């Protein structure tokens, strides 16, 4: 009987035509087999229920992941659209033509490390025959940074046209930007005034990497001077001014 039960045939009942102790043994085997079969049926039903529950959970989780993925794709599409808009704004800000005159020729090129940077530059003719030269970099990226870039450029250029010294222009621009900076952005700026009549370059630096001066023999050196606080951090900052000929 034991080999029969071990083979899984638990619905088999042992038939013994005797009244001795073998009958009791057979009866016990039959009882155990019936109980064991009932227990296996319960376990099988529980496993099927758990399997169904697990499949339902997997399907629900898969649906959630699909929704999350769709939401992420939508967010990414909006981010890319914003970056493209900011990129177009940046291109519109950068000048396409520069002033030229006796003793000065201006050229510019920019190679960004990322698809969108916060760099901008400008050269403007001042009323007294000198030229204002601006190189700057706004923190952050996206439309907000591009807008702050436009505000910074306009603010600095408006002040530059007054003909004030580079240190004065940066100080006034900093105070103005600190008043209109809800996102706490900042801009590093190198601003210089070049006088083609004397060959003198006066400049001030607000947190920007040092400018490089290339000599007629091709050698390049950093312009000496301090690197003061970037614009937009805090108001009432004094900027140091330097000059070279």
List the model feature ranges, each with a label:
Residues 1, 7-11, 102, 129:
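Flexible, glycine-biased helix-capping/connector loops in cytosolic signal-transduction modules
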Residues 2-7, 15, 215-218:
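Extended hydrophobic/Leu-rich segments
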Residues 3-4, 17, 21-49, 53-67, ...:
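Amphipathic coiled-coil signaling helices used for dimeric signal transmission
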Residues 5-9, 36, 43, 50, ...:
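Leucine-rich amphipathic alpha-helices with coiled-coil/heptad-repeat character
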Residues 10, 18-25, 47, 102, ...:
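The cytosolic transmitter module of two-component sensor histidine kinases
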Residues 11-22, 111-112, 125:
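HAMP-domain connector/hinge
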Residues 64-245:
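… and, occasionally, acidic/histidine-rich disordered N-termini of signaling adaptors
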């Amino acid at each position: 009987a034991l080999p029969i039960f071990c083979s899984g045939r638990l619905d088999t009942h042992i038939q013994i035509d005797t009244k001795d102790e073998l009958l009791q043994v057979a009866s016990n085997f039959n009882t155990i087999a019936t109980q064991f079969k009932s227990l296996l049926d319960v376990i099988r039903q529980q496993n099927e229920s758990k399997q169904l529950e697990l499949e339902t959970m997997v399907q629900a989780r898969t649906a959630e992941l699909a929704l999350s993925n769709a939401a992420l794709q939508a967010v990414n599409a909006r981010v890319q659209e914003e970056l493209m808009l900011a990129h177009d704004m940046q291109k519109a800000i950068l000048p396409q033509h520069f002033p030229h005159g006796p003793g000065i020729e201006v050229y510019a090129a920019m190679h960004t490390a990322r698809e969108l940077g916060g760099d901008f530059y400008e050269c403007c003719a001042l009323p007294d025959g000198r030229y204002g030269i601006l190189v700057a970099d706004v923190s952050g990226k996206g439309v907000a940074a591009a807008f702050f870039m436009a505000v910074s450029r306009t603010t600095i250029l408006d002040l530059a046209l007054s003909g004030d010294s580079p240190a004065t222009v940066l100080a006034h621009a900093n105070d103005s930007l600190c008043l209109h900076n809800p996102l706490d952005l900042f801009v590093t700026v190198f601003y210089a005034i070049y006088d083609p009549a004397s060959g003198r370059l006066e400049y001030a630096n607000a947190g920007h990497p040092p400018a490089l001066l290339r000599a007629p023999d091709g050698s390049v050196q950093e312009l000496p001077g301090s690197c003061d606080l970037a614009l937009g951090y805090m108001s009432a900052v004094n900027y140091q001014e330097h000059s070279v000929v």
